[in-house]
Design a protein with these regions (language model features):
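Phosphate/diphosphate ligand-binding glycine-rich loop within oxidoreductases
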Residues: 70-148
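Short glycine-/small-residue-rich Rossmann-like dinucleotide-binding loops
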Residues: 69, 75-76, 95-96, 221, ...
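Adenosine-phosphate binding glycine-rich loop
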Residues: 118-159, 168, 269, 274-370
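An anion/phosphate-binding loop that grips the pyrophosphate of nucleotide cofactors and donors
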Residues: 67-68, 232
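Rossmann-like adenosine-cofactor binding region
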Residues: 209-291
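A short helix->loop->beta-strand "cap" motif at the edges of active sites that frequently abuts
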Residues: 31, 86-90, 109-112, 259-262, ...
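Glycine-rich phosphate/diphosphate-binding loop of Rossmann-like nucleotide-binding domains
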Residues: 6-7, 11-42, 152-240, 287
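N-terminal beta-loop-helix "entrance" segment that forms/cooperates
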Residues: 34-57
Length: 370
C-alpha cells in the first residue's frame, strides 16, 4: 500500500503522523511511504532520517494526496486538505468531528474512509489511541495553568505550590480519566491543593489509592460544583464523552463567581469544551479573559511538545496502521469491532453515533456496511 504523510498545517501544530521508526516498520513490509519535504523538522526528524528508513521525500502535499492510498496525519484535515482528499482514500488521524460540522460535511462529500484515533477502543472500552495525547495534554494543562497564574499573564500572581508559610493554590480537575490523572500527577508534584471531580465513585477510589492524601476525591453528584469552582485558583476541564461533544459542566455564572486572575484550562476544547465561556485558541495566542478569569483553550496542546507527542502517539497508532496497510480496511475493520469503532465517516455516511447525534446528521451502522 502507498502511505502518505503530509506536513501538518494547523496553526502552531508541529507534530508529524509517523516517526522514522514507524516508517521503517512499514517499508520492511514492502509498503511505500511518501513524506512531505521537511514535515518532521519541527519534531526533530530530518528528511535524511526518513530517507534512511526507506521513505520517499515528496515536495508538495498535492502530490502526496494524489498518490497515497492511505493518509496518516495527527490533526483533523484542514479545509484546503479536504479538497485534496480522493474518493476511497483512507484518512487515519484525530478527527474530533462532533464539534466540526463543516469539516464533517466536507469529508462526507469526499467519499473517503475516515478512521478517528479518538474513537478506536480496546477490550475494556478504553480509548488507547487517544490516551497518549490525553496524558500529554493533562500534564501540560498544569504547566500551562501555572504559567497563566503569573501576574504578567494577567493571573492571580500565585505559585501553585505556595512557599514556606504560604498556602498552596487550589487546583480543581474536572474528570478523573487519563487527562485528569495526568494533570494530578503534575499538580500534586507541584504541591497544589488538588481536587479531582468525577461521577464514578470507583474511579475516585482508584485515584485515591494512587495519590493518597495528595488529592481530595470529589463525587460530582455529591458536591456543590459552583462553590468548588468559585474557590479554586486553577480549573482544569478534562471531561470526555467518546466521540461526542463535551458536556458544558461549568456555566457562565460559575465563571463570574471565580476570583479575579483565576485560570481555566479547558483540555476538552477539541470536543467543544466543558466550560461555557471556552473558545478555541492557539499556541500563538493561547489565552483570553472573560470576567477577569484567564482562559487557556489551545485546541492542540500536545503540538507544543511535538517530539514527545509524536513518539508517544506512534506507539499507539502503529499496530492498526500496519493492519490497514497489510490487509486493507475492509478486512481489518470487519474482523475487529474495536477498530471498527474508529470509523467515523464512510463514503459519505456518518458511522459514529456520537458524531451524528452532536451534528444532527443521519447515522449508518458501520457493522452493516461490510
Amino acid at each position: 500500500m502507498i502511505v502518505g504523510v503530509p506536513k501538518e498545517i494547523k496553526l502552531q501544530e508541529h507534530r508529524i503522523g509517523l516517526t522514522p521508526d514507524s516508517i521503517r516498520a512499514l517499508t520492511k513490509k514492502k509498503h511505500e511511504v511518501l513524506v512531505e519535504n521537511n514535515a518532521g523538522f519541527e519534531a526533530g526528524f530530518t528528511n535524511e532520517d526518513y530517507l534512511r528508513c526507506g521513505a520517499k521525500i515528496i515536495g508538495t502535499p498535492e502530490e502526496i494526496f494524489k498518490k497515497a492510498e492511505l493518509i496518516v496525519k495527527v490533526k483533523e484535515p484542514q479545509m484546503n486538505e479536504v479538497e485534496m482528499i480522493r474518493e476511497g482514500q483512507i484518512i487515519y488521524t484525530y478527527l474530533h468531528l462532533a464539534a466540526a460540522k463543516q469539516l464533517t460535511l466536507g469529508l462526507m462529500k469526499s467519499k473517503s474512509i475516515c478512521i478517528a484515533y479518538e474513537t478506536v477502543t480496546d477490550e475494556e472500552g478504553r480509548l488507547p489511541l487517544l490516551a497518549p495525547m490525553s496524558a500529554v495534554a493533562g500534564r501540560m494543562s498544569i504547566q500551562a495553568g501555572a504559567h497563566a497564574l503569573e501576574k504578567n499573564q494577567k493571573g492571580r500572581g500565585l505559585l501553585i505550590g505556595g512557599a514556606p508559610g504560604v498556602d498552596s493554590a487550589n487546583v480543581v480537575i474536572l474528570g478523573g480519566g487519563v487527562v485528569g490523572e495526568n494533570a494530578a500527577i503534575i499538580a500534586t508534584g507541584m504541591r497544589g491543593n488538588v481536587y479531582i471531580v468525577d461521577k464514578s465513585k470507583k474511579r475516585l477510589e482508584e485515584l485515591h489509592k494512587q495519590f493518597g492524601d495528595k488529592i481530595i476525591p470529589t463525587e460530582s453528584d455529591k458536591t456543590d460544583l459552583k462553590k468548588l469552582v468559585s474557590e479554586c485558583d486553577l480549573l482544569v476541564g478534562g471531561v470526555l464523552i467518546p466521540g461526542a461533544e463535551a458536556p458544558k459542566l461549568v456555566t457562565k455564572e460559575m465563571i463570574k463567581s471565580m476570583k479575579r486572575g483565576s485560570v481555566v484550562v479547558d483540555v476538552a476544547i477539541d470536543q467543544g469544551g466543558c466550560v461555557e465561556t471556552s473558545i478555541p485558541t492557539t499556541h500563538a495566542n493561547p489565552t483570553y479573559l472573560v470576567d477577569d478569569v484567564v482562559h487557556y483553550c489551545v485546541a492542540n496542546m500536545p503540538g507544543g511538545v511535538p517530539r514527545t507527542s509524536t513518539m508517544a502517539l506512534n506507539k499507539a497508532t502503529l499496530p492498526l496502521l500496519i493492519k490497514l496497510a497489510d490487509q486493507g480496511y475492509k478486512k481489518t475493520l470487519k474482523e475487529n469491532k474495536n477498530y471498527l469503532a474508529g470509523l467515523n465517516v464512510y463514503r459519505g455516511k456518518i458511522t459514529y453515533k456520537g458524531v451524528s447525534n452532536s451534528l444532527d446528521l443521519d447515522f449508518v451502522d458501520a457493522s452493516k456496511l461490510f
